[in-house]
């Protein structure tokens, strides 16, 4: 199932998620640091939602209180609630 999340406090403008049965199939960040977001997206493909959240939640970007990785964790929590 496809999901869209609007991140807050980061450079990315949107996170597009394809997840089913508790597994991340695909993630795409719109905007943000291209290399970092592509790397995150590639690494989380095929992983359980809860494992991704556990690994990425709380990561900060510089002096910001959040990061694209942390925002992905927040998005995946919402996805898990809807599944």
What is the predicted function of each stretch?
Residues 1-4:
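Short, hydrophobic/aromatic-rich segments at coil-to-beta transitions
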Residues 6-19, 23-83:
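Active-site- and interface-proximal helix/loop "cap" or "latch" segments in soluble metabolic
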């Amino acid at each position: 199932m496809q999901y869209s999340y609007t991140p807050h406090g980061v450079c990315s403008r949107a996170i597009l998620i394809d997840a089913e049965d508790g597994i991340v199939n695909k993630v795409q960040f719109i905007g943000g640091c291209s290399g970092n977001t592509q790397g995150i997206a590639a690494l989380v493909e095929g992983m359980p939602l809860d494992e991704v959240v556990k690994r990425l939640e709380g990561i900060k970007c510089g002096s910001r209180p959040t990061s694209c990785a942390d925002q992905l964790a927040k998005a995946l929590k919402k996805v898990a609630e809807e599944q």
